[in-house]
Amino acid sequence: MRFSSNNRKVLETFYKNFYYLVSLLLFSILILRLFQLQIIHGKRYFVQSEKNRIRAITLKPLRGRIFDRNGEMLVGNQPAYSVYATPYELQSWQGIYTHLANILKIPEDELKTIVKKHQQGKFNPVKLKRQVNFETLSRINEERLDLPGVGFWIESKRFYPSSARVAHVLGYLGEVSPDELEKFKGEGYRYGDVIGKQGVERQYEKLLRGQFGYEFVEVDALGREVRKVEEQKPIAPKPGMDLYLTIDVDIQTLAESLLGSRKGSLVLLNVRNGEVLCLVSKPDFDPSVFAGIITEKQWDYFQNHPNHPLYNRAIQSTYPPGSTYKLVLAIAALESGIITPEWSISCSGRFRFGARNFKCWKSRGHGVVNLYQAIEQSCNVYFYQLSLKTGLSRWADFGRKLGFGRKTGIDIGMESEGVVPDEAYLDSHYGKGQWTEGMLLNLAVGQGDLLVTPLQMAQLAMILANYGKYFRPHVVKRIYEPVTRKEIPIKVDSSQVQGVSHRVYEIVRQGMWLVVNGASGTGRAAALQDIAVAGKTGTAQNPHGDDHAWFIGFAPFDFPRVAIVVMVENGGSGGAVAAPIARQILQEYFRKYPVKLPEKMAISLPVE
């Protein structure tokens, strides 16, 4: 079929018009899209493009320092160097991993794993090793032409100038773990950073750590740094806050030396505000070990040593309190009206209950004793019989009222609650109807399933000193903000034990005075020449070895300032071992912080 010239022209005109129409349509779509991108969404896309072009480089702050109550530095900072590498450069140079692994003394496979696991883009540097020595830095500097993308940052590490370790109060730092990286996601932690693992370093991590700063660099399409962005001012890092502890470093040093190589703990509290003046747990550890790179051998020692040096025995370990807990039973019986302080029994050295003889620590017996004398001489038979009159339920209720079976709330965390057994507890552990009242006799003298922490016993001494008032134990006295130079005081929480009268406290306190100052007192080794001390000894039986030695007390008797607990694992007699240690600590405290009091104030006691 042939087209005429007119038909051909019509067809050409049609195609031309169609082409123009399609072109116009496509151009219109393009214009609309440009309008949408630049006018409607322009601001959003501009911000996104700037984010892609501008990168923020993190500037780490100096960690806050830690001082004792009088301003002596316990923890400071000193320079340390960390080696980093840019993943893109490592992948581009053959043999660089082998060379770098040799310099850093890290297996090559491990080095590759670090880079692969922690890189965030090809051009973001990854920390390979922290706290490298000067020999390593020198090699990297000398061989920098063969190590493209490898460099070092100046950071800081902890140092400990004090003679006192204060280990379990200060705690220690360690590299942030994968779990912690996930937990604190978005808070700026990266692989190789350090974080508080224990003590105030852990509890006050956010304050000590400070706030990151940032400087801004321009990067190209591949993410490589081109230049620093001068138009955008860098944000300076904000140093961490300094902590001033309640600890007195002189008393702490003495306490550490008195416990020496023995296992145990010692706590001294200010009864007027709950300040912890010293807290020792033995064995302890040298915190400076954790300031460096801890070796596998060192970590294995800390984790698997049978004496568990990282464990804070003052707040984490629980023990039977022995005769120190007789004070709780006395309070329960007196407040419930079950006895008066004149109620007496005759101690022959043992008490027959059912088919079993329950012994007193004094085999030939104490003779006739009332409550005052029973506390003074720590007569087991008296408290065996008193427990049967009082009952398990009352005994447990008053134990909980006085702070046992729950945490004290001390600000170093990782605290144990202890155990105050009641009927429900015994039913669940031994079966309903499978336990007998004989268990109550063991509980009466601080044995059996009853478990307490040394800090809980120090808190009991504070409660008795203050006639029921007590403060939350705490180790941080104030916080100092180095930028504004402002001090932030710590709020002190106080409480009053409910349901125990002033009269009952007075009776029990008088018994405690006799323990230290009476002719037959078991705690006479804690007595001071010019200051009246009140206390209670304990010798807790231990199924796994020798007895534990306990002493709790407070002083001065009439105007209490401090409460103390000394617990020596497998130490033997509380009166012979723990009480003399308490005396030396109290002596040092009153030497350093003297009080004007009348010489030992006599107390008129209704003792038969």
What residue ranges belong to the model's regions?
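Beta-lactam-recognizing serine transpeptidase/beta-lactamase-like catalytic domain environment
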Residues: R2-N6, V10-T13, V75, D220-P234, ...
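Periplasmic/cell-envelope proteins involved in peptidoglycan metabolism and beta-lactam response
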Residues: M1-K297, P306, T318, I338-W343, ...
